Amino acid sequence: AAGQDFMRF
């Protein structure tokens, strides 16, 4: 789920 964390931006 760490990959989608930067997608939050």
Swiss-Prot record:
Its main location: secreted. The keyword Secreted applies. Keywords: Amidation, Neuropeptide, Secreted. The modification Phenylalanine amide is found at F9. It comes from the Eukaryota. Belongs to the FARP (FMRFamide related peptide) family. This is FMRFamide-8.
